[in-house]
Amino acid sequence: SIRRQRQMCIRDRLNTNENPYPPSPKVAEALQKFELDSLRLYPDPASTDLVNALAERYHVQADQVYTGVGSDDVLAIAFLTFFNSGKPILFPDITYSFYDVWAELFQIPYERPALDDAFALRLEDYQCENGGIVIANPNAPTGIRQSEEFLRAVIEANPNVVVIIDEAYADFSGYTALPLVDEYENVVVVQTFSKSRSMAGMRIGHAIGNTKLIKAMNDVRYSFNSYPMTRLSVALGVAALSDQDYFEETTAKIVATRERTKQALTELGFTFGDSMTNFIFATHKTVPATHLFLSLIHIS
């Protein structure tokens, strides 16, 4: 828990899935060059430099890009913006733990269809009447990625509601649903700088979608905060995006470590799904999870 973490001297927090590598050297360079005097001025409300850098990086128009204080902030605004029909929204029973928190906070009815025996989503659960859909892809904490065919089927079965695809871990999976944004008007893809770009401490997230959807999110956001992104976060975010070679190098290292870990876990008697993230959702054939948990606490 957060309370327990505050009470303990923790060097490595595996539960937050932080990146073990530092941010790009270009981020360090941008930090050194940052004009401290500029902090006396309010930042650009539209985060124009970061929006333009994201648009260039992902080959979309600037008015298709929304930026926020981490993907949690982006997702919360998306919930407020799109999920107000009174019909229940849908997301899996095992997924990112904040979806139901936001739904309850904003008084949005919701249902949580169970995953199948392989911890995958079942298409039929998302082909019923609903008020919107949220899919973490790859999913957390299972690490399992749904296919593009599955995503298309869900989107096409729900043309009148917004489908949010949360891609916090997509960079470790070799697949992104971003091309679907230009094919379907009801899709919003949410990503973060926290995982693959080693910038969890800066809190930078973004969404990409149809221009009307992004405008709607901005309209809601500006009613809460006219200056959501700091000058420093924008400058360092732009710097991170400028170093694609470093991003690809460190991401490849993490993927290689994941695959080695899978092999080692298999040899130790663990079973798990095909994780496409920077974590592995594993169980042991004979040793209970509680025993493993308590043993790890004792060791650390």
Question: Whereabouts are the PLM-identified features?
Answer:
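PLP-dependent aminotransferase class I/II
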Residues: 22-24, 46, 186-266, 270-273
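PLP-dependent aminotransferase-like
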Residues: 81-136
